[in-house]
């Protein structure tokens, strides 16, 4: 086990081999598709919606549509008509199993399905993976989570998941560690390193990334993709509700396990924040790409692979 987080780690540069950072390639392959960057907006109702999913797919960025008040049939039909990748989320309730049945009967097989529950190391997830595989075979790429241990990663892979999502409660609007005493909040990067030792398939680092440099750190410690909420929230195009405070425009950002998303105050493990509106989403993507190109140049390579080999230090200022 490794008790450190993003702010505790600094990566060490290697000799630069490019003349310009623009030469560095940030693309990543997940399943059958290659995407421009190893980042994906969190599948939260205040971060992603159908319009943004279409925009991201058209620009060759990965996305995962959230599962709240969502018509999967019409969405997948629309994406297939547009010849874009379809990527949806499911839970593990009875209606989710029925939805998989319906999609199969209609021959609407999504390219990606993310099984998305707070504690993903569970029999219910095993049953859902098996159900999807029985109905859809290998036609869809299954991402399962969320988990926090190497044993969980091994089990999900053994059950048939193509990738695992690592991170229990490290997100900015997640209060799992406060409500339950459990989770990876405060040591999320260590959890990625720990879990990656057991993984034979891709890991998606989910939560706890606060600045662009955390993407490179996630890759260094074993992540293939990074799921990010707060950095992608509160853009002009974001689905969060607009709120004006003292003539300043904010957007709501809340956790999937918050009472605001659930519509009831039961088993709450999320909260709501207001974030100042930060401009166009594609401007943030562009800045992330440039920063990640810089990371690759500091790593001494031309692709993301170079970051995986760099040395690092654990800072003396670390709380651990």
From Swiss-Prot:
GO MF annotation: an example: GMP reductase activity
Q: Which PROSITE patterns match?
A: IMP_DH_GMP_RED
Q: List all membrane-crossing ranges.
A: none
According to the UniProt entry, the coiled-coil residues are none
Which reactions are catalysed by this chain? IMP + NH4(+) + NADP(+) = GMP + NADPH + 2 H(+)
Q: Top EC class per UniProt?
A: oxidoreductase
What gene codes for this chain? guaC
From which domain of life does this come?
A: Bacteria
Task: Identify the HAMAP family for this entry.
Answer: GMP_reduct_type2
Asked if the keyword Membrane belongs to this entry, the reply reads no
Q: What is this protein called?
A: GMP reductase
Which keywords appear in this protein's UniProt record, sorted alphabetically?
A: NADP, Oxidoreductase
Residues reported to bind NADP(+): 203-226
Keyword Zinc among UniProt keywords = no
What family does the entry list? Belongs to the IMPDH/GMPR family. GuaC type 2 subfamily.
Catalytic residues (UniProt):
174 (thioimidate intermediate)
């Amino acid at each position: 086990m490794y008790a450190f987080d993003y702010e505790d780690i600094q990566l060490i540069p290697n000799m630069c081999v490019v003349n310009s950072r623009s030469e560095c390639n940030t693309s990543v392959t997940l399943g059958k598709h290659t995407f421009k960057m190893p980042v994906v907006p969190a599948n939260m109702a205040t971060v992603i919606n159908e319009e943004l999913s279409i925009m991201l797919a058209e620009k060759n960025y990965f996305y995962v549509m959230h599962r709240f008040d969502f018509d999967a049939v019409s969405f997948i039909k629309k994406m297939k008509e547009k010849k874009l990748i379809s990527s949806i989320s499911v839970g593990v309730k009875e209606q989710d199993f029925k939805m998989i049945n319906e999609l199969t009967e209609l021959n609407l097989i999504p390219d990606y399905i993310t099984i998305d529950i707070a504690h993903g190391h569970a029999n219910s997830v095993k049953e859902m993976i098996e159900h999807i595989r029985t109905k859809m075979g290998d036609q869809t790429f299954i991402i399962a989570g969320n988990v926090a241990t190497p044993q969980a990663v091994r089990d999900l892979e053994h059950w048939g998941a193509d990738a695992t999502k690592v991170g229990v409660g490290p997100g900015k609007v997640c209060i799992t560690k406060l409500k339950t005493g459990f989770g990876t909040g405060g040591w999320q990067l260590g959890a990625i390193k720990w879990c990656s030792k057991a993984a034979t398939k891709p890991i998606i680092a989910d939560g706890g990334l606060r600045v662009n440099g955390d993407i490179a750190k996630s890759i260094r410690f074993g992540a293939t993709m990074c799921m990010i909420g707060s950095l992608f929230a509160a853009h002009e195009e974001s689905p969060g509700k607009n709120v004006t405070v003292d003539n300043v425009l904010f957007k709501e950002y809340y956790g999937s396990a918050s009472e605001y998303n659930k519509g009831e105050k039961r088993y709450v493990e999320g909260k709501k924040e207001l974030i100042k509106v930060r401009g166009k989403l594609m401007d943030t993507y562009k800045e992330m790409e440039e920063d990640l190109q810089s990371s690759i140049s500091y790593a001494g390579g031309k692709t993301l692979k170079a970051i995986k080999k760099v040395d690092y230090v654990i800072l003396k200022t670390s709380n651990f």
